[in-house]
């Protein structure tokens, strides 16, 4: 029974202890949720407070470091980089300023260049490029000034002229050529002296006193295709070289003016008259126009008789072209009507011996023509009266000189042949009338006369007059002249010249 009584007692105290816990549990549940929220709010506030406190402390520390100079090295480096990025613009500007200052200082040394001194000293990136150009232009201006001092005796060129030269990009050689056109090489001088530097009038005035050197004449005749005006300039001072004589005869591309000028007054040496007398190395010479230009008097005729006062050296060259045609005879027949005037013009030609030696070769004068020229024609007293000047050569000089030259009589015959005009040559000149050389045809066209008319009139009159003159002049022949053909060949060619002067 005690057991029963005691059991519920034990149970009872346990029950009421459990109920209050259960009863308190729902009340506490609500409170626990509230507590958690509050705790979260507190924790958040504390965290924010800590963050704010740390931030404030950091800010205060930064301010202290900046004031005292102690701070973050990285921050200093970044600031230095930013400053360096800004500095290159200033450095380029400084360099440009220095360039402008240097150019201004150099220009102050040259007072003529006043325009570039006004450049602004405050530089800008847009104005830097013109400064470089100004420096280059200034260098070329200095070069131009130095050239001008040497060439034009001018101390300073204006900047505009120097810039113009810089724009045109004249090299120093070009400037020298522009400034000194007279300092050429010898070859250039030989080529350009006669046809370019002197006007035709000056050459005509200089023709009497200024014979050109052989090299000069050779260079002037290299280009045969000059216009008519260029040969006038070329032919003024005529100590003609072999090339000069070959050009007007063989190519025959020169006009009448070339041929007229070739016959300008020059003094022939004794050797030249042997080839000049009858073969006429220049078939295109218009004696009428040449005599009008030159105004040569018949007094100069005796000087053309110097054929035999020369050595026999000229005979080989004059005889070499023996394979010939009758064209040179025709060319001679064309201008025989004006033979006297042609003689007057060719008396004083200052042509060297070699010129006509070479000039006779392209004419293709045959061996037969030399033989046909052998019959002597003695001029009458009328012709001698027309040339009143005393002859400088005695009859002895007219005879060929047998000296150390190793030439046979045949060479002498051929030498004296071209000067002695005969009836046979006149007859031969009458026959082939229509095969004139190009030079003679050009001459006839320029004179306004037909070549055929000249052939018919001149050759006919020439043959008739020769037949009459032979009969008259036989009495006037020198007693020393032998009757044989060789003797007639060796006689003085003055007779042929005087007889031709009548025509």
UniProtKB/Swiss-Prot annotation:
Per its UniProt record, what InterPro entries does this chain match? Hemogen
Region described as Disordered: spans on this chain? 1-129, 381-503
Which keywords fit this entry according to its UniProt record?
Answer: Developmental protein, Differentiation, Nucleus, Phosphoprotein
Region annotated Necessary for nuclear localization sits at 7-87
Q: Where is the composition biased (Basic residues)?
A: 1-10, 61-79
Q: At what positions is Phosphoserine found?
A: 90, 103, 124, 153, 158, 171, 213, 223, 228, 241, 269, 387, 394
GO CC terms: nucleoplasm
Instruction: Spell out the protein name for this chain.
Output: Hemogen
Q: Which organism is it from?
A: Mus musculus
Gene responsible for this protein:
Hemgn
